[in-house]
Amino acid sequence: MTRPFRFGVVAPVLSDMRSWRERLRRVAAHGYSTVLVPDVPQWQPAPAPTLALAFAETGMRVGTWVYASPLRPAWSTAWEAHSLSVLTEGRFEMGIGTGRPGIEDELRDRGLPVRSPAGRLEGVRDAVAALRELDGPDLHTPVVMAVRGPRARALALEVADTVTFSTLASDSREEVTQMARGVLAERDVELALHVPVVGDGVAPFMASAADTDPAAMREADSLAVLPADPLAAVEEIERRREEIGYSYFVIGADFADLMAPVVAELSGR
C-alpha cells in the first residue's frame, strides 16, 4: 500500500522559550504533521512537559524521537506516553528504542542498571505492553520503533505502527533498502526516515556535527541526506517512496523553513 507523505520536525529547545514557540508556530503553518523531541537528560527539558507545551502552542501531533528504554522503568515510560495521548486527545506518538551508542556510560553515571542489548530490547517490549494495557480498548497510542539488528526488527514487526532504522553515516542506500524491504515483506508498516543532514547542514540532536561529514555521506549515497534545493528534495523523496516505501520523513527544525516548499508540495499526497 502506498501511504501518503507526512513530515516531522525534531525541535529541541536551543534558544529562549519565546523563540522556540515562534519556531513551532512556523512549523505548524508550513504544514508539518508532527513536532518531535529527543530524550537526552540534562541536555534538554524532559520530553513530556516539552511536548505538552508544543501541543498547547500548535495543536499539532507530537512525539518522542525517541525514548531511550534504559533511562526509566517500562511502566514509567508507558504511563507518560499514555498520559500524553490522553492530554493531546490522541495526537501523541511514542517513539522508542534501546538507546544511542554509548548509553552504557550515561546509565552508570546516573546509577541506573546497565542491561545487555537483549535486556534493553526487552524493556521496549515491556513499555509497549504496559502502554497497550493503559490505553485499553478505546485508545491506541501509535508506536514508532527505532531498530537496526534482526531482533529489534522482529520486535518492531510485532508491536510497532511505524519503523525507523538506526542507520550509520556509512550505510548506503542499498543497505538500508534491504532492511526496509525485509520489514515490508513481513508486514505493511509505515516507514519513517531519520534525515539529520540537509545540504551541508547537520541537525542538532539528530547527529553529531563533529562526527558527520555530509560530503562523505553523499558519496556513500546515504539516505540520511537530502538536497538543500527543494525541487531536488521533492524528486528524491518521491524516489524513496517509490523504490523503498518511505512515506514519513523526519528532519531537524533548523531546516523546517528551507524544506517548507517540499512539505507544501508533497504532504498528504
Spans of features found by a protein language model:
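Active-site-adjacent structural elements that line small-molecule/cofactor binding pockets in enzymes
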Residues: 1-269
